[in-house]
Amino acid sequence: MPQTQTKEFLSNHPLFRTDDLDEARHCVTQKFCDHKLFLSSKGDQLSVHHNHVAGKYVSVNYLHYGANVQINPGMLERFYLLQIPLSGHALVRHRGKDIVANRKTATLLNPDRETDMIWHKNIIFL
């Protein structure tokens, strides 16, 4: 069965596009929290798309790195993070447990727990 292309949600609300790792980390930090960001695979090329709509108490984000990346935000501190995979998969370590996030399994991250994630290049989160 062929894999379907995932629509880019919130495409009318682009926040940024970049191929630069440091710029991606800086821009994502502005909307979420400080974090470490590394390419997981040599030779991978970033192609970050981040769309964002802000409400009074909640924001909705579409985020795709286009490469295998490791993200380590530590503790989120001031917000919960619901990650809903639209395609692909990621490994999320939270509360001492490993969770494979995919189209059947979303993750809800607590602000007071350490988090470490590996997003595979095909993962797209809403």
Name each model feature, range by range:
Residues 45-126:
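N-terminal regulatory/effector-sensing and dimerization cores
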Residues 1-56:
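A short, N-terminal "cap"/entry segment at the start of jelly-roll beta-barrel domains
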